[in-house]
Amino acid sequence: MEGWQEPPRIPLTQICRVSHTAPVATEIGQLTDTLPLTFDLAEDLVWAGDTNGIVSSYYGETLQPYSRFRAGRGRVTSLVSHDRGLVALTTDALHYSTRGGLTRKHVTDPSLGNNLCMTFTHGPTEFVVGGNPGKLVVVNSERGDVTRVVDSPGMATHMAGSSSCVVWGTENGKLVVGDNNLKELHTFQAHQGPFSDVSVQDNVVMTCGFSAASTGHRIDPLIKVWDLRMMRAMAPISYPLAAFVCQTPDSRTLITSPSGQLEFLDHATQQIKLYQAEVALVNGVKLSPRGHHFVVSDTSGQLQLWSDEPQSSFAEFSAPTAFPTPEQSYPPVSIRDTRYPLGAVGMPYYSDTLLSAMPSSIINVGMPPEEVDEDLEVRQIDFVGHAPNYKQQKRNLAQKYSNQRRTSIAAPKFLSEKEKERARRMEDIEDESFFGDEDTCTEASMSSKKVPRLYRKLEIKYSKFGISDFDFSYYNNHTGLSGLETNPFNPLLQLFRFCSPVFNFALRSVARGTPNRLLNEVGLLFDMMHKARGHVCRASNLMHCYDGIAQTRSLAPEDATNIVLFCRFLLEQIGFEQRQTPALFDSFRQLLGATVITVNTFSCGKMAQAESVWYTLELALGSTFYECLERTLDKELHTRAWCDKCRKYQSLHVSKHVESLPQVLTLSVADGNVDVAKSFLVLDGKVSPAAETDNDAYKLVGFICQIQGNGQVAFIRVGDEWYLFNDFLVTKVSEKEAFMKTPWKRTVMMVYAVGADERFDYDSWKNDMDVSALFEERLVNGNNVSRETTDYGYELIKEVPPPKTLCAIDAEFVVLKNEETEIRSDGTKVVLAPRNLCLARVTLLNEDGHPFINDYIAINEHIVDYLTAFSGIEPGDLDPSISRKPLVSLPTSYRRLWLLLNLGCVFVGHGLANDFRTINMQVPPEQVIDTVDLYYIPSERRKLSLRFLAWCVLGKKVQSGNHDSTEDSHTALLLYKKYQDCAPEEFQVLLLDVYRQGRMCNFKVPEA
């Protein structure tokens, strides 16, 4: 307490003359007005307000003027420091601004009138405002709106808060203690008249105020003290003229009289120190957060700063204050003065993309020339320099541009993190990208043994929101082509997807509804990748079908991920299933199968001939690609085998000759064929095999490469450009890079096609779709139910729905596998794999609200969790042997949805993005109406549940027990119709009211 001193004061009259509303008593009992003062919690600033709504700030112990701005039309009544600025309360508004004066939010509301005081409630964004008789108003400064109004006895004139409670004093001398939700905990009668000041520190409240007198009011000679933990009064502090009271963090109390007498009371040592400030009449006192500075203002317009620790900061951890950069004056320069470069002229402020910011795909910027080696032995003869050429590097060689400073790039943020960052900055942030200048591969980088990161194995990271929170666009270089989630067979699927003959054949087969399930799944995947328009897709349905084939379960672990074996098995299995329909089998064989004639000749003269179909040809050994291909088409070998004619082992000559080649030729490269794997180059993409091909030339569609120490990638020609596909990473590459020899890249498969330039058929097959699945029950075998004994809950449609028909949809799911997590050494929980959900029920309603599809899906796998509370599915409902529900297979239900999608129907539902992702179906945005997005205000950063919207908008309670997809889809349909019935302005008012009601009940439906 020793050493309190007053540095030089400043006159407030230079800036404003102040007069305010909260009363303070003089020695003779008169009332004057107080000045709102406060210290900044984060920087060395002092804030003051005036009667004209002006707020001013002063920097440091010299009280240097820092900023000045208008907070409102009325007088300033309260100031609260914020970590991102200042919150000022005027009589008619609440103003939230930066320290420099830029407005963040300006809140006006009919409930905000005659405002006198405010303080924090929940965190630094929610404030409670007092001054209106009988009520307190809660305002959110970040959202800029009134969240709720709370009834309160009397009119609050003073407020203070702590971490656990809010304290306010009324005009009749009552002190009210409430929790952070403003629920009244206790009320004390502190004074007979109004309050003069209220101070809260930890669990101690001190107040000073007025008593009634014959001439009006006189100052109360006692400072009242209360313990908030025990909710009882403590011994008061006697001080005859206490107008202001402030508590420091180190158990000291500053008491100030109107005449400027300052008393410091140390509660630990009971020492009292008195000081006298040279003032006219004190109308404001405020202590700094550390307790080593305080400011005093008086009615003459003076502001004094006192300190017992000079040259120290006001706050505990003070941040540097930003000052404007001093303007520099430059001498005028003529535009014709060639001594000054044009780059010396600064750029004005701009918000649009500059023309000079061209992407590297448009123009390839070269590197500046290398500097001349200083070691050259230069000799000058007649002013001409000469040096020997040691031929260490090529002359006049242009180098591709490479940014040496960028060595790596951060992993992508989760989508939820990006939304939080956008909200925190209150502006759009630039989307990150995996691709940079260093990803332009040069001959030097490609010849290095280090694998470039474009070719490395990628990994999906999972947040608490699952895989939907992963930013896949980070890995797609604005190509408009869809990648696939991690799967070892993705390169082959991508290769066939961009082979137009295969694509068209698969889509036509799906449209006709062929019984070949593998081929159907391939076609559905291709259609989904086309509709995705660059968004990532999943091959989970195809792989689930593939894994269900008995032969795949006996594969060795190393063969289970072999892409060549997968290709051979996939095509052979499709061909085997196609044999049930000879016409379809012939078409498939002509498309992908090579007819091979095998002739076995024994030394005894016995001869046998057989015809077979090969869907992949393995290149034989050879020095060139053409030599390898010729040996592949005609193979001969000698061995010994058992002869049934001679009944003994004989020498056998085997001749294999490719009699006819398919339209699409699939070639594989054996592991030992290193020369072909590393050095085959067919730059023009055409090759004419030595077989009966009617002189048609094959064109290279693409090829698959094994990356050393990583997985496989695909190089595919799309139009006239080459693209690299590495799971969900898709980027354009040059033809030179695609065919470049590298020590870490080995070709394993390639696809050639006759008519590779054939147009992709995206729409014409829709005219020949088999839509019978929409009109037939198609229950699974063993499901002993019928319409005579069971209420199916729906009626099948009788005719094909026209385009743009509204279909309300809701889907329910069950868990087949729980998520896999890992607890790290630091205690953090990391999701290794999300839970595996499977479609269990899907319901669709027509525009009138009548169900026409209500499919329960038969599941033969083990179900870990039925999620009954959310799905309404009970154990046994999906078992065909015991279920009393109408069960259909997953392919049947999926086909019904796919048919409605391609018929142009529009789906209405709530949370459809998650439903369609789990179903694994890509639906164009123009065919989706999601009530989650319709009833959403982005600035609120909260999406509303179906149950709450039904209660608040429709006035009905849903999901009271277990969820029911029929009820949920019908509720979503009603919400959409409500949206259609409202005019745009009317709907905005409705939506604001929905959020207002939600904040009052915490967005939960009241139970009563």
Swiss-Prot record:
Q: Which InterPro entries is this protein grouped with? A: Exonuclease_RNaseT/DNA_pol3, Haem_d1_sf, PAN2, PAN2-PAN3_catalytic_subunit, PAN2_N, PAN2_UCH_dom, Papain-like_cys_pep_sf, RNaseH-like_sf
Which GO BP terms sit in this record?
A: mRNA processing; nuclear-transcribed mRNA poly(A) tail shortening
Q: Where are the WD repeats?
A: 29-68, 110-149, 158-198, 200-236, 277-316
Q: Which GO terms describe its cellular component?
A: P-body; PAN complex
Domain spans labelled Exonuclease: 808-976
Region Linker: start-end pairs: 314-449
Cofactor note (record): Binds 2 metal cations per subunit in the catalytic exonuclease domain.
Which HAMAP family does the entry mention?
A: PAN2
* Binding partners and assembly: Forms a heterotrimer with an asymmetric homodimer of the regulatory subunit PAN3 to form the poly(A)-nuclease (PAN) deadenylation complex.
Record protein name field = PAN2-PAN3 deadenylation complex catalytic subunit PAN2
> Which organism does this record belong to?
Yarrowia lipolytica (strain CLIB 122 / E 150) (Yeast)
